Amino acid sequence: MFSIFILTHNEELDIAACIESAVLCDDVIVVDSFSSDRTLEIAQRYPAVRTFQHAFESHGKQRTWMLQTIPTKYDWAYILEADERMTPALFAECTAAAKASEHVGYYVAERVMFMDRWIKHSTQYPRYQLRLLDKAHVWFDDYGHTEREVVNGSAGFLKETYPHYTCGKGFSRWIEKHNRYSTDEAKETIKQLSEGTIDWRALIGGKTEVERRHALKDFSLRIPGRPLVRFIYMYFFLGGCLDGRAGFTWCVLQAFYEYLILLKVWELKNHPVAPAELSKSEVTEHTTSDISTTLPNNQHPTCSKAM
């Protein structure tokens, strides 16, 4: 068996459905980044679910912190985000994989659900994320707005997939979120162009989709006209045109996101606006409690902050 972590921040529209998709697990833990909506209240309605709060620094740090700090019933854990769902078939395969322990982590492919349909082609399906892991052998580093896994051992791939409702809270929320993401991606772009390298071996002959995708990401940062190139690649070469109106909209939004990143790169180089000041003010709201946990008996033990 394995535990399930659910990462949240202002997820009142998704958290109930996410938790209910994970009910086959007897150790579900919600890790909330101090939501300002009803996320925590809704999660606490489920007696078997434990809830923790921890101030968000980055995706990599949040994952590593929860894996190293929060006690779990099992050595193995699955990382689930609020706009994703566990399925019975995936749960069964994860249970078998954790029991066999042939690897220290397993990648799972997502099915991007957008505008009421599965976007199969332009999302690079099957696109794998490391989700099932032995907590003692996996942690995460930051990369752009997201994270990259560090695996101390071998990793395998599961056959079952999970649905990811990327725009379930509406286009306004999607645009707001990617506006924030683009700032981190712009910083990563500047860093990679200055210090990074391209792994040509992985780009040309990588053994796994994950290797090839990471190398392609690093390579794409150096391509002129990235927004247009990305649209052409996704819509025509990957087959986004086969996904109908939703596929076209998805490709346009991804090209817009790339253009927003380039605008932020230009801004950071020519007119830096010190966005870190806002981040610091948001973080200091919670300096009085690095972590709080709500259990069924309403006790509030504290844990020392990791990292």
How would you label these PLM feature ranges?
Residues A16, D37-R45, A89:
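Acidic helix N-cap motif at the loop->helix transition within catalytic regions
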